[in-house]
Amino acid sequence: MNIVGVLSGKRKCLLAIAIAFSTFGNAQLVTYPEGLNTGMPHNDDYTVKVREAGGEWKDVFEYEVQVDMDRVQSASMVQFDIGSPVEVMVKKNNGTIQDVKIRPLAIGIQHTVNHNAIFFTLTRPQCLSIEFNGDRLHNLHLFANPLETETYTESSDKVMYFGPGVHRPKDLPNRSE
């Protein structure tokens, strides 16, 4: 018997809402693929994807960042939020992989190499530097942040609220409190 076919229109809608909330309400991985929409520069040295164990791969936006302020160089940065172990795939888009270091080395993250990509698992939030072929300046800065537990709105008391997007110092409100 097809239970969905038996349900009335209103009940079908309620069932769909319940399924959606049960699926997204327990999300343990939050990605931010919308980087291109913010006007931030993209760095295509690497392609990064993450997934909950055995789940579907999700794209992560690779930001172009500046490092070494004495001799400015471009590097890559990605960020996502995790609340449970995740699998990470980092594909090197230019050249071959001879050597990989995932810093801090003391953490001892083990990785596997498959052609021009590495795979590893993160069991908790961490900030890492992934270096290919001894290149410390054109590395990938990976920020696996903890899931957000606090939420704020524009009307929250004693909070200077900045909504989603890119903000610069000129965006600060001029308050004389």
Regions found by a protein language model. Name each.
Residues G9, A16-I17, L142-A144:
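Generic detector of low-complexity/intrinsically disordered segments
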Residues Q28-E177:
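Extracellular/periplasmic carbohydrate-active domains that bind, remodel
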